[in-house]
């Protein structure tokens, strides 16, 4: 016969396990944190240029459109000058409503010019679905940069925006820098892309992919972060004299997060 003490211990362990899973699944994945950083990019005294950066939306049965819409609404409230999307827009684990997804994304381009790159979840599932992602972004007014560059011009400033292909697909092949010698911002899904671009001129790289580790285990860290260089799992970090910013992302795999809230990022470039 089980003792009262062991029964209470087993009951407490069951409750703790259930509560922990409930928190990871029902609480933290929808608890967005608005992150702000001011970065010396132009190195002038003009007003800050505001960029909204979102990545890893991961529309799926685990990440509903309502959650993605909430993240977008929070970002738009900050009145950005430019919006950048860092890849991994879906998980192809179910039939997805791409028309509804386009409707959710449309407010971004209505707010500010919006550019995107692709991530590893956007490319390995066949040409038809890759085509659907590209068409969905396009129908929402979003421009995809696939190893392409464009010049972003404001009344007082210019900089070159580069979007790369996915590193894991062997498609990270950025174009040469322009001859104008402008500040260069790179949009690359995976922060390990820095190694491919080590000898290329750039000043700031914006990445996703890691989800910040998604499950941050006390005393262990981020054992599940899918990158070679763990220094760039999350946040703003130096790479020599350059900087890499890795967002924790909006969505998640399997709808779980622990000590790693989803993120809406506002960057002010000065």
Curated annotation (Swiss-Prot):
<feature type="binding site">
    <location>
        <position position="58"/>
    </location>
    <ligand>
        <name>a divalent metal cation 1</name>
    </ligand>
</feature>
<feature type="binding site">
    <location>
        <position position="88"/>
    </location>
    <ligand>
        <name>a divalent metal cation 2</name>
    </ligand>
</feature>
<feature type="binding site">
    <location>
        <position position="209"/>
    </location>
    <ligand>
        <name>a divalent metal cation 2</name>
    </ligand>
</feature>
<dbReference type="GO" id="GO:0008081">
    <property type="term" value="F:phosphoric diester hydrolase activity"/>
</dbReference>
<keyword id="KW-0378">Hydrolase</keyword>
<protein>
    <recommendedName>
        <fullName>Phosphodiesterase YaeI</fullName>
        <ecNumber>3.1.4.-</ecNumber>
    </recommendedName>
</protein>
<dbReference type="GO" id="GO:0008758">
    <property type="term" value="F:UDP-2,3-diacylglucosamine hydrolase activity"/>
</dbReference>
<keyword id="KW-0479">Metal-binding</keyword>
<feature type="binding site">
    <location>
        <position position="56"/>
    </location>
    <ligand>
        <name>a divalent metal cation 1</name>
    </ligand>
</feature>
<feature type="binding site">
    <location>
        <position position="120"/>
    </location>
    <ligand>
        <name>a divalent metal cation 2</name>
    </ligand>
</feature>
<feature type="binding site">
    <location>
        <position position="88"/>
    </location>
    <ligand>
        <name>a divalent metal cation 1</name>
    </ligand>
</feature>
<comment type="similarity">
    <text>Belongs to the metallophosphoesterase superfamily.</text>
</comment>
<comment type="function">
    <text>Shows phosphodiesterase activity, hydrolyzing phosphodiester bond in the artificial chromogenic substrate bis-p-nitrophenyl phosphate (bis-pNPP).</text>
</comment>
<dbReference type="InterPro" id="IPR051158">
    <property type="entry name" value="Metallophosphoesterase_sf"/>
</dbReference>
<dbReference type="InterPro" id="IPR004843">
    <property type="entry name" value="Calcineurin-like_PHP_ApaH"/>
</dbReference>
<dbReference type="Pfam" id="PF00149">
    <property type="entry name" value="Metallophos"/>
</dbReference>
<dbReference type="GO" id="GO:0016020">
    <property type="term" value="C:membrane"/>
</dbReference>
<dbReference type="GO" id="GO:0046872">
    <property type="term" value="F:metal ion binding"/>
</dbReference>
<dbReference type="InterPro" id="IPR029052">
    <property type="entry name" value="Metallo-depent_PP-like"/>
</dbReference>
<dbReference type="GO" id="GO:0009245">
    <property type="term" value="P:lipid A biosynthetic process"/>
</dbReference>
<feature type="binding site">
    <location>
        <position position="211"/>
    </location>
    <ligand>
        <name>a divalent metal cation 1</name>
    </ligand>
</feature>
